Structure formats: structure tokens, C-alpha cells
Amino acid sequence: MIIKNMDASTNVPYLWLPIFLYDEPILASQVIASIELILYSICLYIVVVSLKIFVQVRMFHLNFIILVAPFFGIWFELIIGKLITMCYQLSIFSIGNLEIRKFYVLWTDDSNKMLVVNSFEGLELLIIAGFMEYHYMFSVVFGAVAVAIERLAASVLIDNYESTNKIFIPIALTVFFQIIAITCSCLALFHKFTIITINGTWIVSCACSSIVFFLVERINLRWKAEMEHPRREKVYTISQRFQVKENIRALDLGKRLIFSELGTISIIGLIIATLLLELVPPSLVHIAENALFLNPFGICTVAMYSIPAWKKRYKNAFPSIFCFLMRLKNRKIDVQSMEPLEEFSKRIYEETNIHFAQLNESWT
């Protein structure tokens, strides 16, 4: 939605927030919010479990862990922004006499389709929520580029990368790309970016990270083939062999995350494009929004299933209905089998007493 400030003295005439409000009955909003909160709670559990497994079951170099861990943890920033927006939708937060529970398109040049206000007073939390969502999206997109560069560095420094931390690499990449993410978030928030610019930024970033991933993977696969060749001419150290295998595993994980991310962005972009062309009803935006907010269902699951050790612990963290029914069935079997066991024990006890009674009589 775009907020237009009618105050002529302001230096910020427009704000562009990546959020949606809906012109719905309050009861419908409450029902939808309740369903969303249940789903977000499940996502919260998924994120916590995935982050715990990723950190505890260490399968990669520390530098890779430092860069990838935020992919899971930064979801909390996104969901806080959504909860703030939800409070405005449910009228928990209000702006004086201004009614904002109305659907506004994501981007438009038509002032009639904007939220027109005399000042931004009372909208501070909504603005913060919009910034959080922008920052999340740019952080994830640029984070993928950072991971690709880190794996490129691991391949270039293959001789001693595994034996040393070189922690300055993930720190420098994180600081650099966070500066870019915050800058882009501010530019988008203050309506300095167009919708084409934002989409172009995401597409170019994803394309660059994908290209780097594929190139580095191809190089490492070639090295692996040389190492396994029986007539190889070059001697590879154990550290180099281990680093190549780790690079391949990390690149495979990175590709899966990028494809999951691209799939999420594609779904959101497709629905928003149809909305801008007024081909679908505004209520469909709920699907587009939650494709973003519920992304841990896809991204975390894809990541956890990429490594067998992670997959096992991840599956154990979610007891299925089948397991529950099997446990219930086993409990019933145990209860039913107790009766013959008790009768058998009683019979043995009686037979033992009779035996000792007869033995005692024979002695006397």
C-alpha cells in the first residue's frame, strides 16, 4: 500500500509499505487471524527446530553456518511485522478517527487507491512493520549472494580453508550485504524504488547467486572426479578432499534454498501481478501474503531433508498421526495381554505352593 501525506511542509510525501489491509467484516478478520496465528505457531516450532538442528548437528564450516543461520532466524522479524499489521486489521491499534481497514493495492499512481493522511502520526508501528518486511526480503535475497561468495572463497582457498576459521569472511559479507539490504529497504519504504526496480533487484540477485552456485559446483565436481581417478597426477591432501566434499554438500543445500526462495517469490509475484491487472479478487492476497509468512514450511523442510543426519532429527521432532495411532494400539495390546499374564502368574504361584506343601508332607 502507498500512503500519501497531504502535509505540504513534509519532506516525505509518500511511503510505500509491502503490507495489505482488507475491507472485511470484523468477524471474518478475526476468523482469518485465528487460523493464521495457528499456522504461524506451527511455523515458529519449525523454525526453532530447524535452527537448533542446524547449529547442533554441525555439518559445515563455521563460516557457512554464520551466513546461513540467519536464513532461519530472520523469519522472526518478518512475523513481528505481520503481527503488527494484524493488530491494525483487527482495530487493536487505531489512528484517531481514521479508518484504514480497507484494501489498498500494493502499487499505484492513482491517489484514489492510496491511503491519504494529513500526517504519519499514529502510523509509526505500521511503518516499522513495513520496514521489517522489506528488510527480511532484501536480507534473504542478498544473503543468498553472500553464501555463494563464501563458497567461492572456500573453493579458491581450498588448500587451508578447512583448517582455519577465517571468520572475517562471513562477518565482512554480513556487514556489507546488510548495509545494502537496509539501504534498499529505506529506498523502497520512502518510495524511491518502483515496483519494477524492486523485482529487478530480486531477480538479478537470485540469478547472480544461482550462476555462482552452479559454476562453483561444477569446479568442485571436477576436482572430486580428479581425486577419485585411479591415475590422477596431482596429489590431494585430506583437508582438500574434505573441503571439496563439504563444498558440494553446501552448494546442494544452497541451490535447494534458492529454488525454494524463487518459488515463493514467483507465487507472490504472480498473484500481485494479477491483482494489479484486476484479474482476481483482493481476497486472494491472503494466499500471496501467507506464501511469504509461511515459507518455513517449504524452505526449512527442504533444508532439513538435504542432509540425512538433519532429516532424521527433523522427522523425530514431528510425531506423526500414524506414530500416535501405533502407540495407542500398542497400549491397547499391552492392556489386553495383562489378563492372561496375571492368570498365568497366579497359577504358577498356586502350583508352587502345592508343590512345597506336598514336599513338606513327604518329609513328615
From Swiss-Prot:
<dbReference type="Pfam" id="PF03125">
    <property type="entry name" value="Sre"/>
</dbReference>
<feature type="transmembrane region" description="Helical">
    <location>
        <begin position="125"/>
        <end position="145"/>
    </location>
</feature>
<keyword id="KW-0812">Transmembrane</keyword>
<feature type="transmembrane region" description="Helical">
    <location>
        <begin position="167"/>
        <end position="187"/>
    </location>
</feature>
<feature type="transmembrane region" description="Helical">
    <location>
        <begin position="290"/>
        <end position="310"/>
    </location>
</feature>
<comment type="similarity">
    <text>Belongs to the nematode receptor-like protein sre family.</text>
</comment>
<keyword id="KW-0472">Membrane</keyword>
<feature type="transmembrane region" description="Helical">
    <location>
        <begin position="257"/>
        <end position="277"/>
    </location>
</feature>
<keyword id="KW-1133">Transmembrane helix</keyword>
<dbReference type="GO" id="GO:0007606">
    <property type="term" value="P:sensory perception of chemical stimulus"/>
</dbReference>
<feature type="transmembrane region" description="Helical">
    <location>
        <begin position="64"/>
        <end position="84"/>
    </location>
</feature>
<feature type="transmembrane region" description="Helical">
    <location>
        <begin position="31"/>
        <end position="51"/>
    </location>
</feature>
<protein>
    <recommendedName>
        <fullName>Serpentine receptor class epsilon-27</fullName>
    </recommendedName>
</protein>
<dbReference type="GO" id="GO:0016020">
    <property type="term" value="C:membrane"/>
</dbReference>
<feature type="transmembrane region" description="Helical">
    <location>
        <begin position="195"/>
        <end position="215"/>
    </location>
</feature>
<dbReference type="InterPro" id="IPR004151">
    <property type="entry name" value="7TM_GPCR_serpentine_rcpt_Sre"/>
</dbReference>
